[in-house]
């Protein structure tokens, strides 16, 4: 189940936790983050490739492409047996910003976005069917867990794709990892 947990940037206390999709979308919208639920136009097999995935979500993908003028769209898939999973996970674990907004749609599996806005950190557990759009220059990080298992559609307005500017902050080390965060809910 998708979930929003809102912590103070000093995570000593208990977070506010929201699991209703509409409430999650409303709360995230209040900080400029788009969050919505999509449904596939057809059933996908577990080994569906990029073309099959994009075809299943064609109407939603086309709507976003028209609205934002994305220059490229691709599908990334990461499984627990991927030989580079630790290196790929490490790439996203430190707080960073982008000069462009970051849009991800979860076709399968789950991942955890951490959005550092003001004196709060919003942990957004995204699962199958969730679309999240993180505004440009929003400090954030992402954790896929030690055994990642997800498939995402990624949208880019620039041809060079994902380019991060790391903030140098160690704030990410003070918050639960993906695996720690989902453990109580599993």
Question: PLM ranges: what are they?
Answer:
Residues 85, 113-115, 122:
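Short, solvent-exposed loop/turn segments at secondary-structure junctions
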Residues 37, 74-77, 154:
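Structural signal for conserved beta-strand scaffold positions within catalytic alpha/beta enzyme cores
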Residues 97-117:
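Short, conserved beta-strand element in jelly-roll/cupin
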Residues 74-99:
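Conserved short histidine dyad/triad with adjacent acidic residue
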Residues 1-70:
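N-terminal leader/capping segments at the start of a protein or of a new domain
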Residues 143-186:
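Double-stranded beta-helix
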Residues 126-146:
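Conserved metal-binding segment of the jelly-roll/cupin
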């Amino acid at each position: 189940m998708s979930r929003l947990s809102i912590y103070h940037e000093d995570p000593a206390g208990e977070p506010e936790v929201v699991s209703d999709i509409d409430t999650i979308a409303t709360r995230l919208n209040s900080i400029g983050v788009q969050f919505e639920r999509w449904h596939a136009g057809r059933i996908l097999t577990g080994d569906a490739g990029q073309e099959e995935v994009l075809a299943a979500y064609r109407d939603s993908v086309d709507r976003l492409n028209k609205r934002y003028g994305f220059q490229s769209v691709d599908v990334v898939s990461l499984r627990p047996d991927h030989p580079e999973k630790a290196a790929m996970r490490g790439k996203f674990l430190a707080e960073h910003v982008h000069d462009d907004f970051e849009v991800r749609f979860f076709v399968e599996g789950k991942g955890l976005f951490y959005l550092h806005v003001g004196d709060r950190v919003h942990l957004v557990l995204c699962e199958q069917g969730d679309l999240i759009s993180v505004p440009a220059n929003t400090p954030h990080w992402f954790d896929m867990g030690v055994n990642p298992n997800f498939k995402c559609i990624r949208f880019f307005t620039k041809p060079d794709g994902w380019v991060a500017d790391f903030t140098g902050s160690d704030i990410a080390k003070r918050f639960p990892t993906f695996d720690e965060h989902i453990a109580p809910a599993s």
